[in-house]
């Protein structure tokens, strides 16, 4: 079996969404728990690609879904395109999650006998683009304007980035040495990161490192 690469995964995602939109997902009738629906879709995609490719499959509870392509699968409703992911460290908000994301956005419709998952968008976000949009935008502006370490620490403090003085000091040194890439997610502080995808799913392939596809 061929090993799956990123391009293969994108091609399969397009076909997968088309197939899923045509099915009656009876086991999801009346289910409104986004996490359960997401897990169902993620497992279905893992099964779908594993029939054609040699892949390493991860566990959605521990680690990422497709370690062999360094990608985690996210599925979310068009009503509120967001999900959560494990918090590793504050650095993720500035330099990205550390892995790619493959995001499926669906519209769920139920009747007494049917459940339709109408797949609307698929977006692949490279790891370098998974940081927070506003935070990286402002930090990049500050660096362009000649900000120093104290300025950066002040900004991180104002934004209530998780961490203490040592974390802020270390991050500020890194930011001044390595300007963060512009991120395109909205990453909200919580016990887990809350990721919002409203912006990234509608970039229409205008940004390098972000691939967008729509079925409708």
Residue spans of the language-model regions?
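Acidic/His-rich structured neighborhood in mature extracellular/periplasmic domains
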Residues: 71
């Amino acid at each position: 079996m061929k090993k799956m690469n990123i391009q293969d995964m994108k091609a399969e995602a397009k076909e997968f969404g088309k197939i899923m939109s045509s099915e009656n997902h009876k086991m999801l009738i009346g289910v409104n728990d986004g996490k359960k629906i997401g897990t169902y879709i993620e497992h279905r995609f893992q099964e779908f690609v594993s029939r054609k490719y040699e892949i390493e499959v991860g566990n959605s509870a521990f680690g990422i879904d497709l370690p062999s392509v360094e990608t985690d699968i996210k599925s979310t409703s068009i009503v509120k395109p967001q999900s959560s992911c494990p918090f590793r460290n504050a650095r993720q908000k500035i330099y990205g999650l550390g892995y790619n994301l493959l995001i499926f956005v669906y519209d769920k419709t139920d009747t007494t006998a049917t459940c339709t998952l109408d797949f609307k968008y698929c977006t692949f976000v490279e790891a370098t683009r998974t940081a927070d949009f506003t935070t990286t935008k402002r930090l990049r502006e500050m660096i362009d304007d000649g900000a120093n370490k104290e300025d950066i620490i002040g900004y991180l403090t104002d934004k209530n980035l998780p961490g203490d003085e040592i974390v802020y000091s270390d991050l500020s040194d890194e930011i001044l040495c390595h300007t963060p890439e512009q991120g395109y997610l909205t990453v909200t502080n919580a016990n887990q990161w809350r990721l919002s995808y409203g912006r990234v799913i509608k970039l229409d392939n205008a940004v390098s490192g972000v691939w967008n596809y729509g079925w409708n």
